[in-house]
Amino acid sequence: MKQFLDFLPLIVFFAFYKLYDIYVASGALIVATALALVFTWFKYRKIEKMTLITFLMVLVFGTLTLVFHNDLFIKWKVTIIYTLFALALLISQLVLKKPLVQRMLGKELTLPDKVWNSLNLAWAVFFLVCGLANIYVAFWLPQSVWVNFKVFGLTALTLVFTLLSGVYIYRHMPEEQKK
């Protein structure tokens, strides 16, 4: 259910883009993200930081897109969010000395520090590459290509990278945890 709530605003954005335009889709994205946030709060009585940051970014950049009637803002949102995620991962590892990935998954998994560091760094690089790819697609290709890339391309890349991360984790798990 949680994954569906995270993905729902993206589906709404895509549908409204196909039915109307980028501006109606941006407004629908704001509303859908807010509703998903409210529903999550009432169902789980908890909002994850990443979810809250994403909502705030959608609210700010979606509103700027509507107020200035300029799709550059909603296009930049993707890169800024990915860059913030990458920075959070890098700061957690390099400054705070405990990878964010380990903080998120360390209660369920026991892995060597080297594995946590590699996984954390891999996700940071992944987010940076996705942010750069978004810049390229958003500013050098037609808007319709960017929307498809945002909805399907980045989602597929994230799913594949998550699966690869799962394989990497499994290969380094202690035998007793694999059961």
From Swiss-Prot:
Pfam families, sorted: IspA
Membrane topology field: Multi-pass membrane protein
Cell compartments where the protein resides: Cell inner membrane
Tagged with keyword Membrane: yes
Superkingdom of origin: Bacteria
A GO-annotated cellular component: plasma membrane
Entries under InterPro entries matching the protein: YciB
Regions crossing the membrane: 22-42, 50-70, 76-96, 121-141, 149-169
Main location: membrane
Keywords annotated in UniProt: Cell inner membrane, Cell membrane, Membrane, Transmembrane, Transmembrane helix
Known role: Plays a role in cell envelope biogenesis, maintenance of cell envelope integrity and membrane homeostasis.
Family that this chain belongs to: Belongs to the YciB family.
Official protein name in the record: Inner membrane-spanning protein YciB
Species for this entry: Serratia proteamaculans (strain 568)
Lineage of the species this protein comes from: Bacteria, Pseudomonadati, Pseudomonadota, Gammaproteobacteria, Enterobacterales
Gene: yciB
